[in-house]
Amino acid sequence: MKPPILVFIVYLLQLRDCQCAPTGKDRTSIREDPKGFSKAGEIDVDEEVKKALIGMKQMKILMERREEEHSKLMRTLKKCREEKQEALKLMNEVQEHLEEEERLCQVSLMDSWDECKSCLESDCMRFYTTCQSSWSSMKSTIERVFRKIYQFLFPFHEDDEKELPVGEKFTEEDVQLMQIENVFSQLTVDVGFLYNMSFHVFKQMQQEFDLAFQSYFMSDTDSMEPYFFPAFSKEPAKKAHPMQSWDIPSFFQLFCNFSLSVYQSVSATVTEMLKATEDLSKQDKDSAHGGPSSTTWPVRGRGLCGEPGQNSSECLQFHARCQKCQDYLWADCPAVPELYTKADEALELVNISNQQYAQVLQMTQHHLEDTTYLMEKMREQFGWVTELASQTPGSENIFSFIKVVPGVHEGNFSKQDEKMIDISILPSSNFTLTIPLEESAESSDFISYMLAKAVQHFKEHFKSW
């Protein structure tokens, strides 16, 4: 026996093709013999079921494509995470090496502290680090080294601030990635289950479908384009993102393709610093003669760059003192300046890797949310057809008229322009439609009206995931 829904829908389509309004005799037969009315059309295929099956097929196709995209995103995300861990490991190794070298350096430079600390406090140092970018790096290195010596000499100034354990952060990331994988995996299972149910419905009704539709529905989803993709768009401006196409470009792999660059030598910085000092000395001479270099340029929060020019001899003495401190540093702690540079670059690498991991994570989450949204919309639109899979051959009609109640009298008011029709949808549920006569027996739109109401009822009562 054909699936019950086919009995009713085929009959509806046959009547709609006739394009003729029912007569008074037809109205009597509808009221007196509803079962005969429901059996009248067992010829054509149910277009609503066919449309829903097409939707379920496309749902499967779209989910498979989303699975591929999700896999690429997750591979990229995990690679980013690995690279972030490597960057952090590198930074820790450099920091440990630096701390060891600093311990060796502290004792040897203790005697130089009193002589070199004035270099760090000089107005000329503030001038050089403000107006000459090359000096900033060198000053930072010297200052960091001698501050550590100061902390060594005066332990109560030691900075006890420590970072949070890294292990806790990575554990949180593990949980986050696992949650994403679990949600997507469950969504994949749910979509697969719905498609299998719809395939069962297709097999029950296969003989009623044309060969072209059978060929499409049975085809490999990777080798044939679907009939259409329904345009399910989210509300305006919801989850707007520049990467919404979700075609995974190759540049994702470049996000985490990190490697250490060749560290700049400290000697190059020193050379630039000395050159800047010579240039400044020339500018001071020009300023003494009223040259153009006497013009001052304000620097936000640092005063005027022209201030030290008023006492060039003091700055030249400052240069000599700092040069001596630099010589001490190079002689007693040759590895420390370079390790400071490496530590700075390793920290920058960690920061970049954290940012890029966060970007890919955000894209992965958006992709999951968009996929969930699309699957839910397609399930709401087409998933009702899977309810028919529970009907076995030989069961009662899914769509059938049980009774027709003519006009109802309420006091002095007569509702003879309406009729009540009880319709059975599946053995477990009945519902009643109140249909105006002009929209039923006397109208050629009666079949379309009934069909729309029945499908709407199915969708409204179709259970969620």
Swiss-Prot record:
Signal peptide bounds: 1-20
Record-linked InterPro entries: Clusterin-like (IPR000753), Clusterin_C (IPR016015), Clusterin_N (IPR016014)
Primary location class: secreted
One term under GO cellular component: extracellular space
Coiled coil: 62-107
Coiled coil keyword on record: yes
Keyword annotations from UniProtKB, A to Z: Coiled coil, Disulfide bond, Glycoprotein, Secreted, Signal
Residues with attached carbohydrate: 196, 257, 311, 351, 412, 430
Spans traversing the lipid bilayer: none
Region entry Disordered, spans: 280-300
Pfam families the UniProt entry points to: Clusterin (PF01093)
Cystine pairings recorded for this chain: 105-333, 116-325, 119-322, 124-315, 131-305
One Gene Ontology molecular-function label: misfolded protein binding
Record localization: Secreted
PANTHER family, sorted: CLUSTERIN (PTHR10970), CLUSTERIN-LIKE PROTEIN 1 (PTHR10970:SF2)
Family: Belongs to the clusterin family.
Protein name: Clusterin-like protein 1
Native organism taxonomy: Eukaryota, Metazoa, Chordata, Craniata, Vertebrata
